[in-house]
Amino acid sequence: IDTAKKAAAEAGKPYFTFPTLASNCAPVTGVGAYYYEDHTFRQVYYVDRPSYHTFIHTGVIANAPREYLWAGIGDALSKQYEVEFSARGDVLPYGRNLGVTLAGTCSQGLLEYGEAALRSADEKTASEALEYVAQNIICSTGIISNLEPEDYNSSVAHALYNSHTGVAHEGAHLHGAVVCYGTLVLLTLDGQLEERNKLYAFCERTHLPHSLSDIGLTDPEEL
C-alpha cells in the first residue's frame, strides 16, 4: 500500500485502498515508510493526501492470517500513548487537538474487544468485535495520523521498533508486535505504571510481546 500511494503521488493520480489485513493504519493515512534492502528502517514520507476512499470488507479481514490482526492490535495500542506523550503541554491548533482527543479513545476499545476479535479471527467470523477492532486499527489510528505531524504521531514505541530493525535479533517479528513492547517501555518511562500494568496484563493474555526475549533480544552485547 505504501508503494502504491507513493506511485500515485508521483503520477499525480487519485488512489483508493482495499486492505486485506488489519495490521496497521496504512490504508487510511497519507504516511508511508521506506526501508533499505536489508529491511532496516530508513525514513517516513508524506504524500499530499490520503486515499480518496478505503474499502474494508470484514469478511476478508476475518479470513486473513490471524497474526496480522494480532500485531495490528499491538500497533494501534501505541497511538493513544504516543500522541498524548508527544503533545503534552503544547498549545494545539484545532486539527491537532482533534487528533489528540481522538487518540484518547483508541486503547480502551482495543483492550475491551481485542480478545473477542482474536477469537473471531480464529473462527474466521466477521463478528462485531472484529469489525470494531479492525476499524480502530485501520481507521481511527489512520485519521489521527492524518491530523498530526510526524513528531506527534510516534515517539518511544515506534523509535524502539525502528531501532529493532537495525540490530541483530532472533526470529522474525511483525511491526505491531515490536511496537506493542515499545508502548510498555513508553508507559514505564513516563511513569504511567497503572496503565502499563493494565496493558501488560492484556499482552500476557494475548501473547503480545512483553519482554525483550519476546522480540528476539537476548544477547547482552546487543542490549
Question: Across the structure, where does each feature detected by a protein language model lie?
Answer:
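C-terminal charged capping/lid subdomain of soluble metabolic enzymes
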Residues: 192-223
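N-terminal small/polar loop signature for handling phosphorylated ligands or for N-terminal nucleophile
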Residues: 1-15, 116-129
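Short glycine/serine/threonine-rich phosphate/pyrophosphate-binding segments
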Residues: 1-6, 25-28, 153
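Active-site segments that bind and position negatively charged phosphate/pyrophosphate groups
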Residues: 93-201
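A glycine/threonine-rich phosphate-anchoring loop and its flanking beta-alpha core
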Residues: 10-102
